[in-house]
């Protein structure tokens, strides 16, 4: 087991190594295709299961695109949110005290406690607008 409580396997190591080389979010299919291109013989189902396990352990970020597809990226170590371009998929991590304060205020207003949240904001980046 690793520090995050995830069992270490050859497949998990290959997926983790690949994710470390990428800056952007990728679908399980895209990751599977890249692993095969690199000579890794890992089934698509194994890629999906491994990504789910890594996401549950906080090792990868999962983002649901506006089309409903799940995409994955190596997780930053700090709490953050995402701005996502609908056109090119470019993603920017944002951490903002105002977002955290707003989330806490809304939760308190509605009687919630022990709250966690994820926020994904979709729009069009400046490069795609040009």
From Swiss-Prot:
Instruction: Kindly summarize what the UniProt induction comment says about this protein's expression.
Output: Induced by zinc. Repressed by SmtB in the absence of zinc.
Does the keyword section mention DNA-binding?
yes
- Where along this sequence does the record place binding of Zn(2+) 3? 79, 81, 100, 117
Q: Which GO terms describe its cellular component?
A: cytosol; plasma membrane; protein-DNA complex
What's a BP term from Gene Ontology annotated to this protein?
positive regulation of DNA-templated transcription
The free-text cofactor remark is: Binds 2 Zn(2+) ions per subunit. Three distinct zinc binding-sites were identified in the crystal structure, but the exact biological function of the third site remains to be determined. It could be an artifact of crystallization.
- Assembly: Homodimer.
The Swiss-Prot or TrEMBL record describes its family as follows: Belongs to the Fur family.
Query: Domain description from the entry?
Result: The N-terminal domain binds DNA and the C-terminal domain is involved in metal-binding and dimerization.
Indicate what this protein is called per its UniProt record. Zinc uptake regulation protein
Query: What is the protein's species of origin?
Result: Mycobacterium tuberculosis (strain ATCC 25618 / H37Rv)
């Amino acid at each position: 087991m690793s520090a995050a409580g995830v069992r270490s396997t050859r497949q998990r190591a290959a997926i983790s190594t690949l994710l470390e080389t990428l800056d952007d979010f990728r679908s399980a299919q895209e990751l599977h295709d890249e692993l095969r291109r690199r000579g890794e013989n890992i089934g698509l189902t194994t890629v999906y299961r491994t990504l789910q396990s890594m996401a549950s352990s906080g090792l990868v970020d999962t983002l649901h695109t506006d089309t409903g597809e799940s995409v994955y990226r190596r997780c930053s170590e700090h709490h953050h949110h995402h701005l996502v371009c609908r056109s090119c998929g470019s993603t920017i991590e944002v951490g903002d005290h105002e977002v955290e304060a707003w989330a806490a205020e809304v939760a308190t207003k509605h009687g919630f406690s022990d709250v966690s949240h994820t926020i994904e904001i979709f729009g069009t980046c400046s490069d795609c607008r040009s």
